[in-house]
Swiss-Prot record:
Belongs to the bacterial ribosomal protein bL19 family. The keyword Ribonucleoprotein applies. This protein is located at the 30S-50S ribosomal subunit interface and may play a role in the structure and function of the aminoacyl-tRNA binding site. One of its GO terms (biological process) is translation. This is Large ribosomal subunit protein bL19. NCBIfam families: rplS_bact (TIGR01024). One of its GO terms (cellular component) is cytosolic large ribosomal subunit. It comes from Cupriavidus necator (strain ATCC 17699 / DSM 428 / KCTC 22496 / NCIMB 10442 / H16 / Stanier 337) (Ralstonia eutropha). Keywords: Ribonucleoprotein, Ribosomal protein. The keyword Acetylation does not apply. PANTHER family: LARGE RIBOSOMAL SUBUNIT PROTEIN BL19M (PTHR15680:SF9), RIBOSOMAL PROTEIN L19 (PTHR15680). PROSITE patterns: RIBOSOMAL_L19. It holds the Pfam family Ribosomal_L19. InterPro entries: Ribosomal_bL19, Ribosomal_bL19_CS, Ribosomal_bL19_sf, Translation_prot_SH3-like_sf.
Length: 130
């Protein structure tokens, strides 16, 4: 492992020490809690939407979340290990067959819906046994 990879791995460990990042994939509906600074006030703002793309590049990993706000599609790119992200919560898992869901940009209404991924009974039983 070269020096850059080692430094990036240490930085990721430092940034994730006080928060947990759940496993999520494109198609999942997530709520991203973002720290917003307005003047001297600091507050947490929730941004809920569908993950349409995820870019895994170590420390430079990012993901794009799309939501419909007052009839208009809004996309926001987040850096996965950004200190501005307070928390990420997965609301529901989506069952998709693509890594990048850019086709959702042209869709609206019912055609933009994503089928929910159902958990098998065997997986539920295994989780309950733990």
């Amino acid at each position: 492992m070269n020096i850059i990879e080692q430094i990036e791995k240490e930085e990721i460990a430092r940034l994730t020490a006080n928060k947990t990042i759940p496993a999520f994939a494109p198609g999942d509906t997530v709520v991203v809690s973002v720290n917003v600074v307005e003047g001297n006030r600091k507050r947490v703002q929730a941004y809920e939407g569908v993950v349409i793309a995820k870019r895994n590049r170590g420390l430079n990993s990012s993901f794009i979340v799309r939501k419909i706000s007052s009839g208009e599609g809004v996309e926001r790119t987040f850096q996965l290990y950004s200190p501005l992200i307070a928390a990420i919560e997965v609301k529901r898992r989506g069952d998709v067959r693509r890594a990048k869901l850019y086709y959702l940009r042209q869709r609206s209404g019912k055609s933009a819906r994503i089928k929910e991924k159902l958990v098998s009974k065997a997986a539920v039983a295994a989780k309950a046994a733990q």
